[in-house]
Amino acid sequence: MSSAVETVTKLVTPILEEQNFELVEVEFVKEGKNWFLRVFIDKEGGIDIEECAFVSEKLSEKLDAMDPDPIPQAYFLEVSSPGAERPLKKESDYEQAVGKYIHISLYQAVDGEKQIEGTLVHLDSEQLTLSVKIKTRVKEMTFERKNIAKARLAIQF
């Protein structure tokens, strides 16, 4: 985790706790020539634009008040909901995703694939099982949790 992400996580957490919001993820990424500091937040029933703006304003105030500046380069601050394809980070995220369609990225390929989508049917501390449609048939596939690089909710087409 970068120092910018750690700093922002520490700064935004009390703001979110005060409002009963949840921190989903903080990322600091360069896209083209620009840097983006993205803070994804949520709450029971979903987050709205006014709530995102409130958090953005409070976080900006805290960042601007720090000396020295914790993020010396210019960047764009974005505070938003995680959207329909919410990342699965915490154990509770995975538990809430049982029965839902998800996308996983693997460190090592399984059956020649590193990107797999399916319905999460089972979960324990070591593995998760997806119901995956391969051509015309449905197959259950089990994956070691330690082989999962990233996971998120997905939209099924």
Swiss-Prot record:
Disulfide bonds: none annotated. Keywords: Cytoplasm, Ribosome biogenesis. It comes from Enterococcus faecalis (strain ATCC 700802 / V583). InterPro entries: Ribosome_maturation_RimP, RimP_C, RimP_C_sf, RimP_N, RimP_N_sf. HAMAP family: RimP. Pfam families: DUF150_C, RimP_N. GO terms for cellular component: cytosol. GO terms for biological process: ribosomal small subunit assembly; translation. The gene is rimP. Required for maturation of 30S ribosomal subunits. Belongs to the RimP family. It is found in: Cytoplasm. This is Ribosome maturation factor RimP. CDD domains: YlxS_C.
